[in-house]
């Protein structure tokens, strides 16, 4: 693979002082962000994938890099296997008296907290703020008098109701709640499915920024009150309007050192997941106005706009995607399909070594733990890998997988000393995986490429060299997973219930079509 042909996949910074939305065409769902000095930090939900809760950094709100994860592994054995749609939901990040705090809801376990004084370094092990089922989307807040609070929403799938917000007084060090708290807002009548609350204070008002109306079609609501327990005035401040951006909501109000205001939020585009946008924001009569073309204080998203004024120009950059496995650690673009184990892989001499893990042959590929995955980086692309197969053992299956609701994989299987090609397709909601043989494979090296067109159509190509790739198998349409977009990656398993061999990958490279 010629590295000079590798380019960044999605560039929002136009190089002329403007940016285009989305700023990240990648599934960083449920974003929250803060500014500390001249640095911006953003986090996102990651459900059952590990490491969990990605942490991104930027100097200008447009160019972002993943710098860390808040949790290395999920703290419950339940997540040793994939539990689609469970795990870490919408988190919140805050900075208080020299410490960074991240609140993480796990709807089946409770509200967890991790903290650090160095966001690039190690975060504390997760600790309970409250052990409770069905509470989601927590956000901490410290008032001027030193008292601390946590606002939360509710998951109807776990607790039987939604569209309500709740306020709990908490210990200032976030080690627990002080009392049972109380309901503070009922959105059933005017703000259905209100959730994802973020709590701020400005000019004597408490503000709750919260999405409502549902993930795909919803809008951004803001509540305000002079009392942290309400009653609350309400206003819709951002909606789709005449823009092509559906459901512009759930995110973070941030400012620049010179006082500009901005709003980060997601847009659910289906197969690519919930991608990230940046909107200008200003204040009128102590209400935020987000976006442009505001009518009665409700704006709509921008597609192109002047970059934030942060006092300096910073290089154009994007999160990592392609990987040549040249370091001694996995790139931060990678996550596993469940709680990972170090023995699943090695990095050596510029290769990723995947050790085939024992797997029940009846288990669907989407439910295999040791799938090494990363998010889609653009709406259309090809992804290519080169795998060395000479150390495979009988029963081993290895290849390139594209996950999602409907998933597909192109793999090499070794049985009785002979290798053959196989395509696997299925749906995570059904037990109906189809395994289609595609003929013998007589080389110890395989190049596998998958093309994704129109954010939907996935087609595989294989060859013994990068130059002789030929189409193989069936095109499989992508569908999103449970609250997540499609992820692509590599895997190696052994379906004879034994310790398998290994497969060596030279690279995993994304390119524009």
Question: Where are the language model's segments positioned?
Answer:
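Carbohydrate-active catalytic/glycan-binding domains of CAZyme proteins
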Residues: 1-513
């Amino acid at each position: 693979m010629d590295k000079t042909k590798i380019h960044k996949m999605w560039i929002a910074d136009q190089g002329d002082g403007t940016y285009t939305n989305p700023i990240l065409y990648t599934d960083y769902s449920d974003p929250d962000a803060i500014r500390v000095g001249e640095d911006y930090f953003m986090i996102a939900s990651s459900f059952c994938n590990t490491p969990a809760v990605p942490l991104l950094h930027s100097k200008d709100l447009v160019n972002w890099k993943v710098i860390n994860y808040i949790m290395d592994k999920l703290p419950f054995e339940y997540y040793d296997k994939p539990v689609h749609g469970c795990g870490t939901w919408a988190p919140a990040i805050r900075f208080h008296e020299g410490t960074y705090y991240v609140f993480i809801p796990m709807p089946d376990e409770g509200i967890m907290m991790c903290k650090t004084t160095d966001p690039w370094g190690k975060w504390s092990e997760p600790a309970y703020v409250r052990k409770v089922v069905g509470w989601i989307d927590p956000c901490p807040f410290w008032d001027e008098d030193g008292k601390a609070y946590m606002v939360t929403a509710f998951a109807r799938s776990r607790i039987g109701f939604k569209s309500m917000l709740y306020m709990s007084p908490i210990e200032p060090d976030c080690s627990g709640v002080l009392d049972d708290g109380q309901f503070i807002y009922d959105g059933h009548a005017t703000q259905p499915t209100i959730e994802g609350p973020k709590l701020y204070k400005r000019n004597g008002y408490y503000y709750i920024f919260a999405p409502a109306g549902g993930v795909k079609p919803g809008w951004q609501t803001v509540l305000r009150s002079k009392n942290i327990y309400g009653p609350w005035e309400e206003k819709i401040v951002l909606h789709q309007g005449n823009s092509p951006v559906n459901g512009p909501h759930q995110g973070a109000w941030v400012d620049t050192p010179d006082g500009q205001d901005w709003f980060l939020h997601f847009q659910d585009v289906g197969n690519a997941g919930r991608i990230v946008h940046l909107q200008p924001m200003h204040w009128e009569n102590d209400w935020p106005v987000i976006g442009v073309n505001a009518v009665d204080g409700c704006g709509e998203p921008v597609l192109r706009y002047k970059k934030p004024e942060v006092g300096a120009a910073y290089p154009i950059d994007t999160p990592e995607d392609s990987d040549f496995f040249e370091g001694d650690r996995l790139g931060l673009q990678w996550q596993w399909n469940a709680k990972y184990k170090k023995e699943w892989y090695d990095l050596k001499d510029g290769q990723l070594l995947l050790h085939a893990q024992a797997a029940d042959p009846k288990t669907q590929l989407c439910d295999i733990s040791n799938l090494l995955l990363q998010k889609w980086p653009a709406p259309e692309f090809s992804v290519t890998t080169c795998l060395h197969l000479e150390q495979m053992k009988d029963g081993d299956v290895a290849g390139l997988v594209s996950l999602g609701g409907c998933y597909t994989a192109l793999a090499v299987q070794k049985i009785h000393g002979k290798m053959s090609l196989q395509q696997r397709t299925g749906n995570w909601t059904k037990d109906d995986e189809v395994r289609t043989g595609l003929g013998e494979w007589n080389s110890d090296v395989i190049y596998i490429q998958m093309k994704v067109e129109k954010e939907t159509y996935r087609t595989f190509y294989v060859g013994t060299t990068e130059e002789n790739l030929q189409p193989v198998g069936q095109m499989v349409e992508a569908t999103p997973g449970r609250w997540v977009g499609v992820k692509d990656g590599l895997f190696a398993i052994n379906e004879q219930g034994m310790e398998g061999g290994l497969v060596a990958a030279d690279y995993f490279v994304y390119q524009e079509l």
